[in-house]
Amino acid sequence: MSAPVLTRPRCLRSWSVLWSIMVASATIAGGAGRGNSAQDSPNILWFVVEDMSAHFSCYGEKAVETPHVDRLAREGTRFTRAYTTAPVCSPSRSAMITGCYQTRIGAQHHRSGRGSAPIHLPREIVPVPVLFQKAGYYTCNGSGIAETGASNLKRQGLGKTDYNFQWDESAYDASDWSGRTPGQPFFAQVQIHGGKMRGEKTVQRAGLAKQANEETGCATDRSSVSLPPYYPADDEILDDWTAYLDAVRLTDAHVGRVLARLENEQLLENTFIIFMTDHGISHARGKQFLYDEGTHIPLIVRGPNVPRGAVRADLVEHIDMAASSLAAADIKIPSWMQGRDFFASDGVPREAVFAARDRCDETVDRIRSVRTDQWLFIRNEHPARPMLQPNAYKDGKSILQRLRSLHASGSLSPLQEKILFAPQRSKEELYDLKTDPFQLENVASDPKNAEVVQEMRQRLSAWMASCGDDQPESPSQYASDMEVYLQSQKGERREVIENNIQLNTKWRAEGF
């Protein structure tokens, strides 16, 4: 399998000129190269992008061109079937940084453990940066863009973490690798805002388009946008998706600046790079849910001993990047780590990948999924509740408000009504990914699929048992986290959250 042949948008400027500018900028910002390419251990660098699906041109997206991410794919290995184990930031990042399923470490509820009921990792589990520190690595978490002055060496400048368990900031030496000892290898996380760059208002979207045009030579043409069939071709929905694709362009530009810096510091060829996102696009059926829109992510690896120009279609999970990075640095993978080295010579491909969605902010849910080569099976523990049950975060978005308005006016198609606004959900969902890539038709109740359903039930139950995933969140944990959450909210939004908390508490008492 080979990557698709791509053509450049007409408005794109010469990338050779822009690349030269980036390289020159990196030289000014980063200073002279250190000449560390001969060091014994490779550097490890993770690009971690927020709220973004695989809408990059190397993955077939035709409305944008992403030359820097495409370069990583061309010079490395691109995975076409990589999935996050959690479709929301904090559980995903908690899993990523430990190489363990979030349900294994008790970190599955979004922004949990912040209050009077802190979450502690099991005694044997150690965050990945600590493992690298113990091996002599300099660890950092920031933007990947060299800064002037000493501020980039301070821990208070760290990039996003969002871990749901107790951890010590000393796991990171700084926000940038420029403070390390000459020749010392580094482990760096480069945080990119990704889909969070798109705003809610027309003026914000216009500003993003202007920025995309200035930084990449092109802004997205709305007429080129292709929506999934369960979203209406409505102006608000199209404008939002257009802004999202401009965020994809700017994400790519950020990657380009970091690559330019690595080249100027003569570090690129000895750096093991992973590009990924924490979960899919923030949309009605994306972020927070276990369909492809929420769990399918881009995953590209470039570096020493990584096959160049390779495209792999085997199933991988985002927790595999932890084990793969340790292996690349010749650090022993701990026996407790559930992620796998996807380049291991004796590696066995995964037969299935798993995911879990639990409480998101004030909104309680419990959904589990297992995916094989052909099938996606989803189990809903609260099927009597609608998919889009009240949630202040989602309901505050203009796209959700517009979808609810179209629903109220009867303007959605029957398919869109069924997918987005069914009053209840099925206890079990089964989708044939070969014939139904958008997961539109639940075939779990079809008698001819009875054996498949039984097999998927067994797979899912075995995985849950292996993680000790057998209980919902306790009322005390919920109360503790909601107390902290409300402290950060004001005005009308706080009132909405308080009402949602009351509703969720009532539903729990009723066994709903």
What are the roles of these predicted feature ranges?
Residues 58-65, 78-100, 108, 141-160, ...:
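Short, solvent-exposed turn/loop segments enriched in Gly/Ser/Thr/Pro and often Arg
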Residues 33-42, 48-49, 54, 78, ...:
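Long, internal low-complexity/basic segments
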Residues 54-63, 110, 167, 178-322, ...:
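Active-site-proximal cap/lid insertion segments
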Residues 15-27:
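Bacterial N-terminal signal peptides
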Residues 31, 46, 53-126, 131, ...:
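Active-site segment of extracytoplasmic enzymes that catalyze sulfate/phosphate-ester chemistry
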Residues 96, 144, 149-166, 268-271, ...:
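Polar, surface-exposed loop/tail segments
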Residues 1-13:
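N-terminal secretory signal peptides that target proteins for export/translocation
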Residues 40-45, 75-80, 135-139, 183-187, ...:
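Loop/turn elements at helix/coil->beta-strand transitions in domains of secreted/extracellular proteins
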